[in-house]
Amino acid sequence: MILRRWKGFCLAAEEEALFPRGAEMCGEVFAPLVFLVRRDPLRARGLYPIRDLSELDEPEGIGCLTPSSPAEGEMAAFVRAHGAGVLNAAFSRAFSILQAWSAAKKDGLVLTLVGLGDVGGTALLALKLLGRELAKIQIFDPNRAQCQRYEMELNQVLSADGRTLPEVVICEEQDLFRCDLFAFTASRGVPGLDSKVQDVRMAQYEANRAMVGTYARMARQADFTGLFCQISDPVDHLSRSVFLQSNQKETGEFDFAGLLPEQVQGFGLGVMAARCAYYARQLGLDEDALRVYGPHGQGLVCANCCGGNYDAAISAELTEKTRTANLRVRELGFKPYLAPALSSAAASLLRLVRGQEHYGAVPLGGAYFGCVSRMTRFGPELRREALAPALRAELEKTYAALEAFEY
């Protein structure tokens, strides 16, 4: 393993060609340590943390959600003590993102919110009241009057505890990516309340894919170093599409000069966790033991627990109730947007910026997979725990479907 010092990082690689220009020789390992690799950018992560050296070369998939077997040796002991990052040099902007994320702010953040419909407007209300880490929320919507209304009304809101609330400002198109977080809630083709469509979320894919692609390309052109937060449905599929479209030239050819996979995260699983807890309470189940994985919709997996007490029948019942909870609200004559806007968007976004565990769809191989993670300077750190064999089989099935989807 070759070691080099660069911009305050200790870089480690098997090949000289992986080091950036200006990297200097160093005699011994120090923190922060970053391992450099070159892997297929279509199917590999770009920047991620490891707590054990065995995680450096593990296959990308559901196994990344389970504990790794401890590695041995001096380098392994250093990684266990200090942690490390893994950076995929196949992405042309890899080193600039490494620098930007290591110097990221913890507060005084700027968030751009695109789309002031039902979900966007509700999420904005919560972020205004609860977003103490945010200095400014930039809002953008084709309906200029809607922007003016929210700017006017939300800057007339009093703080309940005396803390300064984030300022709400109208954003011009050229400033959309002058921010730390870009939250996309806009949507087209949402089925009406009288629609017989069973998968309301996937029905929106084609229209929303085209719309979000415009913003993915804008992020690329702006050399965006922040986080693209995909909130409109279908969250997991659109997250992958944002990553892919940002890394294509105008000809459609991939050059991987756009967003790193970890610069895109989907926010749809939070409400599924909340809905699962709602139904678990009715069934008298232990809420702390509940687990929720996978996409926001078809393919969702809810479990009464992840370990030895996993019950396939109870988990299947929880999954079905949770997956179709939106239809129950529609049957009452309402669009189900309150819980998603608050649980999936506002609460999950704020837990992310606070460095707390949260629900979201993160890159894993050739898909974005919903799970619990915590944001670090090296990207999302996935929660690892032992999985019951039957539960793991369910997760493998839904992961395979996400990978096989034609984005």
Predicted features, each with a name:
Residues 1-108:
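Glycine/serine-rich phosphate-binding loop and adjoining beta1-alpha1 elements at the start
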Residues 17, 193-257:
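Rossmann-fold NAD(P)-binding glycine/threonine-rich loop
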Residues 55-70, 281-407:
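Long, compositionally biased stretches enriched for glycine and/or charged residues
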Residues 118-122:
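Hydrophobic/small residue at the entry helix of a nucleotide-binding pocket
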Residues 134-138:
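Short beta-strand element of Class I
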Residues 142-179:
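Conserved N-terminal Rossmann-fold NAD(P) cofactor-binding segment
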Residues 232-307:
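Rossmann-like dinucleotide-binding core of oxidoreductases
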